[in-house]
């Protein structure tokens, strides 16, 4: 079938269950790429099979995926493992998009400002502006 793409481009936001095996995620990325889509993996920091494994993030990117993390996941103290992992993969240039996971304004409000302050130091223009603009225009990132 056809996937619902972003703004009529080849980009498609893909979400997996937190418990999905890495082999399932990897095969799905391959399938999307072979079908002509450009998958953006939503909130990869939640996937148990990927969390803490920079090598798997790299492999998914090399297979053709782009990586999106949630803004909330960047906001955490020094002992917050999720925030530490997200900051690490961002520092290594492995994050392409920042999302809010905001499904509505009553129960999940967007909280981009604190995360933007974390991102702003080095990657803000690319992650917050340039990559989303290029994606919406259907251009490569």
Predicted stretch roles:
Residues 94-110:
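Short acidic/histidine-rich active-site segments
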Residues 1-3, 84, 139-141:
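Short, surface-exposed amphipathic charged segments that create phosphate/polyanion-binding patches used
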Residues 1-67:
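Extended substrate/RNA-proximal surfaces in nucleic-acid metabolism proteins
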Residues 17-19, 44-47, 70-76, 102-105, ...:
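Active-site beta-loop-alpha junctions enriched in small/polar residues
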């Amino acid at each position: 079938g056809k996937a619902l793409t972003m703004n009529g481009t080849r980009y498609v936001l893909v979400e997996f269950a937190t418990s999905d095996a890495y082999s399932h995620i990897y095969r799905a990325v391959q399938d999307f790429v072979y079908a002509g889509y450009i998958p953006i993996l939503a909130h990869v920091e939640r996937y148990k099979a990927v969390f803490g494994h920079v090598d798997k993030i790299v492999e998914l990117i090399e297979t053709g995926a782009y990586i999106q993390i949630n803004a909330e996941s960047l906001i955490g103290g020094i002992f917050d493992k999720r925030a530490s992992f997200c900051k690490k993969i961002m520092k290594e240039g492995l994050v392409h998009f920042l999302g809010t996971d905001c499904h509505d304004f009553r129960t999940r409000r967007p909280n981009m400002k604190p995360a933007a302050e974390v991102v702003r130091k080095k990657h803000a223009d690319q992650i917050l502006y340039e990559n989303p603009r290029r994606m919406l225009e259907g251009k490569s990132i």
